[in-house]
Amino acid sequence: MGALRVHEFTTVDGVVDAPMWTMDYGFPDDLAASIGALTAPAQGILLGRTTFEMFAPAWSTRTVEDDPGAPLFNDTTKYVVSSTLTDAGSVWRNSTAVGGYDAGRIRELKEQGDLYVSGSATLVRALVADGLVDELHLFVYPVAVGSGIRLFPEGGPRTPLSLLGAEGLSNGVAHLTYGPATA
């Protein structure tokens, strides 16, 4: 079975949405290398509808000259989890809608190979709750923004995890990798 790796840019206060705050920290080579290592094994990209609709116009016209990440996002099959979007392929090539969230369907996709998830906080919460995330990569930026969507919102269930790795990056970002809690 393939691995499911999640990538989130987050603030120290846990906010993961509208990450324009990342721009203040640049995109140094060590950050690019960390993300490259995370995405390299991906045979598919799993996205929630909202993230898909934000990524499609941003990535679909980019070339490798614009951004080294463009081939990953444009050439890799994208699976969109949505109960409302039915024709993802007409929005962004190599995209397919897989229907509303279904843990069994995600397991089937994992059987086909490694999956990469970026953003998609609602989807990620469900994946974590169902034990489908093998690696949760949090790129923690040294800023608190005070409000916004959190990956693990207040009032959510207790979610124990195990630290798999920690890396300090040159721009002050901490790359923390977590996996399912071990007994």
Model-based region annotation:
Residues 1-132, 142-183:
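Portal/gating segments that form or line small-molecule/metal binding sites
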Residues 137:
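Conserved catalytic/dimer-interface elements of ABC ATPase nucleotide-binding domains
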